[in-house]
Amino acid sequence: MRWTAGYRLMLTAPVNKIIPFSNVDGPGNRTSIFFQGCPFNCLFCHNPETIHLCRSCGACVASCPAHALSRDDTGVVHWDSSKCVQCDTCIKTCPHDASPKVRQMTVEEVLREVKRSAPYIQGITTSGGECTLQNEFLIELFTRVRAMGKTCLIDSNGSFDFEADPRVLAVCEGVMLDVKAVEPGWSDQLISHPRDTVLKNLDCLLRVGKLYEVRTILFPGRDRENEETVRYVAAHIQDGCFYKLIRYRPFGVRERYQKLLGEDETDVKYAEGFAELARELGAKKAYIV
């Protein structure tokens, strides 16, 4: 948080990156805002650099070929975007699943970037990391964006209890929810977090009409776990809700977890079989990617 000259407290949030135009984060062309920080540690995470905040350990500074990173007298790492060539050497070097390129931004600063794309987008999607860690920030941001005539979607891992605090749902069009596993043991192993809040959110979002899409990853060699999750989700969601079944791909997964999950990607025909099962059970908008 920051104080303005008039002593008004301003909300800030750690932003990993902002993609001006995306056609894979909800309906239409959208600006996607990725916040830093996530309470999960999913084995299959493709962007683990968004999990933790930078500790300023300094490991990345010497590795930067563009000299875009430095440390001040207190040891804090600073990123110079004007020098950065986006090679991501710093991210590959970081031993803490973090990034030195995170910006602490106010709602006004985020809006300024959204407005540049406003004539060409249908709305914004907030993601991460886990964007709901910044709940108060989202409420203000969404209120301002909707005043521009744009829509707002949340991409969430389901860790935030929407039923306990539904305020953000009142200012957004819907949620794209990850349901990664329903079997307790597999869930604990896969995401290092209990599944209870996720499944509670599935019911809550359906009940209030705010569930836009559910996403599940299909893993090779995990027939029972895949089927259990697909059956559970398909039996719950409504016809109007999209169900995205994502084929596991090892590219981008941390090496230490590739050995646990396997080095083969999920076969297309294998995945399509689960999509067909989901459609038979009522999830008419099930599809694979």
Language-model features: locations:
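Auxiliary Fe-S-binding modules of radical SAM enzymes
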Residues: 2-27, 220-289
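Conserved AdoMet/S-adenosylmethionine-binding subsite of the radical SAM
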Residues: 108-257
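N-terminal pre-triad scaffold of radical SAM enzymes
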Residues: 15-59, 76-86
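Iron-sulfur cluster-binding cysteine motifs and their immediate structural context
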Residues: 43-53, 59-77, 89-104
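Short Fe-S-cluster ligation motifs
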Residues: 67-75, 83, 87-97, 112-130
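FAD-binding FR-type
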Residues: 82-83, 103-111
